Regions:
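Secretory targeting signatures
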Residues: 1-32, 60, 170
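Long beta-sheet-rich domains in secretory-pathway and surface-associated proteins
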Residues: 25-230
Length: 230
C-alpha cells in the first residue's frame, strides 16, 4: 500500500516549522526489520533572486521491504537552508510505502552555494520496538547564482575646456550573490571619437565580490579649438 502527502500541506508546515507524523495500517510482524529510504530527485534548485520564492522540493520515499510492521523515525538537516519537515515518523505494514514531499527554503539574496541535506532514519519492529536498523539518504540543495549590477558616476556632470584631458570616475556595485566578472565599455565611444574626443578605459573588465564595489576610471581628452562645455 502506498501513501502520498500533498505539497500544499508541506508548504503550510514549512511556515509553521512542525514535524510530520504519519500512519499506514499495520499487519502482524513476521520477520526482521527491512526497509529503504530514497529521494526522487537528487538535486533541488533554489531561485533566490529578489521576488523569487527561494523554495524547492523533492519527495522522500520510505518502503517496508520486510514482513514485519515497522516504525521509522527520520530526521532531516542541511546547513544554511531550512528543511521542512525536519522530522518524519511513520508506521508501515509489510510491503507498505509512503511518499513525503520535502522542501528546502533559502532567504532571498542568499549566497550562491551547494548544501548537502542528510536524512537519518531509525527503523524498529512495531510490537516489540526491537531489531533497530539505521539507514541514511540525502540530496543536494543548490542555491542558484544570479547577477545584478549597478553603476553610478562620482560626478554626474563635469565641465572642461577644449584640448584638455580629464578622468571620469564611476562606481560599479555587484548586487548579485557571488563574485562576478564585469566587462566595461563606452556605449557611444564611436560618436565621441568621430567628434574628436579620445576615450580610454583603465581596464576592460573587473572581478567584483558579492556586495562589493569597484572604481572604474575613464580618461577623456577633448578636441582642440572647440567650445567649452560637455
Amino acid at each position: 500500500m502506498a501513501t502520498k502527502i500533498s505539497k500544499a500541506l508541506l508548504l503550510a508546515m514549512l511556515m509553521l516549522g512542525t514535524s510530520l507524523v504519519m500512519f499506514a495500517p499495520p499487519a502482524d510482524a513476521q520477520a526482521a526489520v527491512a526497509y529503504s529510504i530514497s529521494f526522487t530527485n537528487g538535486q533541488v534548485q533554489l531561485d533566490v533572486r529578489p521576488g523569487a520564492s527561494g523554495i524547492g522540493c523533492t519527495e522522500m520515499v520510505i518502503s517496508n521491504e520486510g514482513q514485519a510492521t515497522i516504525d521509522v523515525d527520520i530526521s532531516l538537516s542541511g546547513g544554511g537552508v531550512t528543511i521542512s519537515p525536519g522530522a518524519v515518523s511513520v508506521t508501515l505494514a509489510p510491503g507498505g510505502s509512503i511518499t513525503v514531499p520535502v522542501c528546502a527554503l533559502a532567504l532571498t539574496r542568499s549566497s550562491y552555494k551547494t548544501v548537502q541535506v542528510n536524512a537519518l532514519a531509525s527503523g524498529r519492529e512495531t510490537n516489540t520496538q526491537l531489531n533497530q536498523v539505521n539507514k541514511n539518504a540525502g540530496f543536494a540543495v543548490i542555491v542558484q547564482q544570479y547577477a545584478r549590477l549597478s553603476v553610478q558616476a562620482s560626478q554626474p556632470f563635469q565641465k572642461i575646456g577644449p584640448g584638455k584631458e580629464f578622468v571620469l570616475n564611476f562606481i560599479a556595485v555587484n548586487n548579485g550573490n557571488y563574485q562576478d566578472t564585469i566587462a566595461v565599455e563606452v556605449m557611444n565611444a564611436k560618436d565621441l571619437e568621430d567628434a574628436g574626443f579620445t576615450v580610454a578605459l583603465a581596464a576592460a573588465q573587473y572581478q567584483i565580490d558579492a556586495s562589493g564595489e569597484q572604481p572604474v576610471q575613464l580618461t577623456v581628452a577633448t578636441p582642440r579649438g572647440t567650445v567649452v562645455g560637455w
